[in-house]
């Protein structure tokens, strides 16, 4: 009888769902928030000051009501020049995106990456029980992928 292997029986650990890398593990918790009544001029100042290209818009109760981005501001700048109107008196509520797509904190990083790929969006607000708790960006996903070990690619 020949020896087939010098190794013993291979034991493969079954991965539990708790080992999955989740959005909550890599998202940003410190956010630059905007309000619907904030002026576009103030928003652009915040973009420069905090080096962000957009962020969530919340009402006085802290509920997510929209997203404002540099692209929204570019539209206002373009329109103001075309109509020869100042941009100082316009507010976020006139230019923000109202129907906001969100990601739940319990979503896996891979599902989030797939959503980023399908939608071409740069960031998503992260929700836990209908409450805004953070934000995840494409950059967060890329950083997480670079830090993963081969065993976590599931």
Predicted regions and their residues:
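Tandem CBS (Cystathionine beta-synthase) repeat/Bateman regulatory domains
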Residues: 1-154
